[in-house]
């Protein structure tokens, strides 16, 4: 809910037709609707204990009202719906997700990181500062890698790493411990990763929030304080082969 409120604050008294450069073709209006409807989509999946895909266009109350105050209330309401649905249904209740059946509370974590990254999109579009607690940013990297490990190479697409190459990420924020390190490689034809320390063919070192924005292509490395060591081509291949 805190992330939802922080996202909403960026949309008070803004020009909703402002383009969002990190989401090509989108405006702030579309980004706002996407986030609000996404929370309601997840809430409906959980509340109805769905075991198959739900078309987001059919979500109940999927469009915000036209007045700004009503739209903000609609946004907050979507996040609350998800929390309520998980509590009512049970955190371990199996439901549909785009990665297969997962416990209902999987959606809370997914939506937290979805909204955080889209808050970064809005902040970049508006030229505003973006901050995120390092532990949240680090978990965002972990959650994203969990998805990449499942989805990369699907439908015959090339893997974002070549056999024998490794990528190491190191978040320098105090207190993260092993949760702030990720070593990514190819094992048995699939992307695999762990929190163990290692030396990669390419390595990135910097704050967790800047690392998150870099791997999700929200900020080019040149606009961050993240340091890149090793083979630039490994990093570029990784960027080109992974989703936004």
Q: Over which residues does each language-model region extend?
A:
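A glycine-rich beta-turn/hairpin centered on an aromatic-Pro dipeptide
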Residues: 142-184
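Short, contiguous alpha-helical
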Residues: 15-55, 98-155, 211
